[in-house]
C-alpha cells in the first residue's frame, strides 16, 4: 500500500476491499448480471421454500390454499431483503474507508484507536477503486433492494 503505513495489513482499506471482493458471500454483486440474478434467485428460492413449508405444515393449505403461495412470496422477499441489506452494509463500509482521507485503526486490539492520514498517492488509488469498483456495486444493490421492497409492498397489499 505504501512505504510507511502503520495500519495492520488486514485493516488497510485496499486489502479489506480485496478480501471482501474475494469472499464467496460478498463477491456476487460485483459479478456479471447473469451470475447476480442467479444468486438473487437462489436466495429468494430458499426463503420461498422455507416459508412455503412452514405455512404448509401449519394446516393453512386446507383453509386458504392461495395464502401459502402469498406467504412464500413474502418470505422469499424478506430473506432477500435481509441478505441485500447485509451486502449493502458491508460494501458501503468498504466504500467509506476507501473514499476517506483518514483511516481509523487499532494496532493491538486494546481499544487504542489511531488515525492515519493517507498519502496523496494512496488516497488517489483508494478513491479510484471506491468510485469505479465499489460504487457501481452499491448502486446495483440499492436498485435491487428498491425493486424487492416494492414487490414485497405490493404483495402485502394484495394479501
Swiss-Prot record:
Signal peptide: none annotated. Pfam families: CGLD27-like (PF06799). InterPro entries: CGLD27-like. Keywords: Cyanelle, Plastid. It is found in: Plastid, Cyanelle. GO terms for cellular component: cyanelle. Its main location: plastid. Belongs to the ycf36 family. This is Uncharacterized protein ycf36. It comes from Cyanophora paradoxa. The gene is ycf36.
Amino acid at each position: 500500500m505504501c512505504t510507511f503505513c502503520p495500519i495492520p495489513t488486514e485493516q488497510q482499506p485496499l486489502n479489506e476491499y480485496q478480501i471482501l471482493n474475494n469472499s464467496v458471500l460478498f463477491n456476487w454483486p460485483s459479478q456479471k448480471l447473469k451470475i447476480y440474478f442467479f444468486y438473487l434467485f437462489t436466495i429468494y428460492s430458499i426463503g420461498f421454500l422455507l416459508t412455503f413449508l412452514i405455512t404448509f405444515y401449519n394446516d393453512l393449505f386446507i383453509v386458504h390454499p392461495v395464502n401459502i403461495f402469498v406467504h412464500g412470496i413474502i418470505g422469499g422477499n424478506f430473506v432477500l431483503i435481509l441478505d441485500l441489506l447485509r451486502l449493502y452494509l458491508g460494501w458501503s463500509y468498504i466504500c467509506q474507508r476507501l473514499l476517506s482521507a483518514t483511516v481509523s485503526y487499532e494496532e493491538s486490539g486494546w481499544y487504542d484507536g489511531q488515525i492515519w492520514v493517507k498519502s496523496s498517492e494512496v488516497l488517489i488509488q483508494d478513491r479510484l477503486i471506491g468510485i469505479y469498483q465499489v460504487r457501481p456495486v452499491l448502486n446495483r444493490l440499492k436498485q435491487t433492494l428498491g425493486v424487492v421492497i416494492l414487490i414485497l409492498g405490493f404483495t402485502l397489499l394484495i394479501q
